[in-house]
């Protein structure tokens, strides 16, 4: 599954195992997420558990839970794509939707989106280094096709562009991504670019430590100067 545009998961690759138990379709399918030990989303556990009402791994009622008469595998996949890998995963945490639209909620959503973006990049590295058996070609083909787009987005973040989500619409959130996020990104991107270069993605050389570091530090200095001027 590919992360959607407009979310912190954009262009990321997410692999799930689906198993149909003997009790299917009376019981829902069993779904395992290849997490590499990372918590990229409130619904995707490091253990591989996918927390979703439709899978009976989270509380729900009515159409939210599995029904042998109406629920389908397609519905499971669409739910993961549309309800889990969202633009604002922070609000997927139980009870956090009550903070949607508040200044505190926006700040927390922005911070969570930044972390989700970083973990998505780290997941990409794990996939490139240790793709699940039988999926080596899928992983390589995806990142050869989208790797340049991933790096371009990272370059934009290093210049201050905010990660997609609820954090910066003028209602109490930040207009740019945080300096801490850019510093963390500065460490991840050169490693990711090197991994992309190994599979044939072009243009990765300009994302080396030297030039990238100067770009990110300049963006952070500019952001700090703007903040000082507004105080």
Where are these regions (language model features)?
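Short, hydrophobic/aromatic beta-strand segments
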Residues: 10-11, 27-30
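N-terminal onset of structured domains
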Residues: 1-12
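Domain-scale recognition of soluble eukaryotic interaction modules
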Residues: 30-231
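Proline-anchored loop/turn motifs at beta-strand termini and strand-loop-strand connectors
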Residues: 19-25
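Residues embedded in well-ordered secondary-structure elements
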Residues: 5-7, 20, 41
């Amino acid at each position: 599954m590919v992360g959607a545009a407009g979310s912190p998961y954009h262009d990321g690759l997410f692999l799930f195992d689906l198993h149909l138990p003997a009790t299917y379709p009376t019981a829902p399918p069993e779904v395992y997420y290849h997490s590499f030990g990372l918590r990229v989303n409130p619904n995707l556990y490091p253990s591989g558990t996918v927390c979703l009402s439709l899978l009976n791994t989270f509380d729900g009622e009515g159409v939210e839970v599995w029904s042998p008469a109406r629920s389908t595998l397609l519905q499971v996949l669409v739910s993961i794509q549309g309800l889990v890998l969202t633009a604002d995963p922070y609000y997927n945490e139980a009870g956090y939707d009550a903070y949607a639209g508040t200044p505190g909620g926006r700040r927390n959503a922005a911070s969570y989106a930044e972390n989700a973006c970083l973990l998505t990049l780290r997941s990409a590295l794990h996939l490139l280094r240790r793709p699940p058996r039988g999926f080596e070609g899928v992983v390589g083909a995806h990142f050869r096709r989208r790797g340049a787009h991933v790096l371009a987005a990272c370059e934009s973040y290093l210049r201050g562009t905010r990660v997609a989500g609820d954090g910066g619409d003028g209602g109490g959130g930040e207009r740019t991504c945080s300096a801490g996020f850019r510093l963390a990104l500065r460490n991840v991107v050169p490693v990711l670019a090197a991994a992309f270069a190994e599979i044939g993605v072009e243009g990765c050389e300009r994302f080396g430590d030297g030039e990238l570091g100067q770009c990110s530090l300049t963006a952070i200095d500019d952001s700090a100067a703007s903040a000082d001027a507004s105080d």
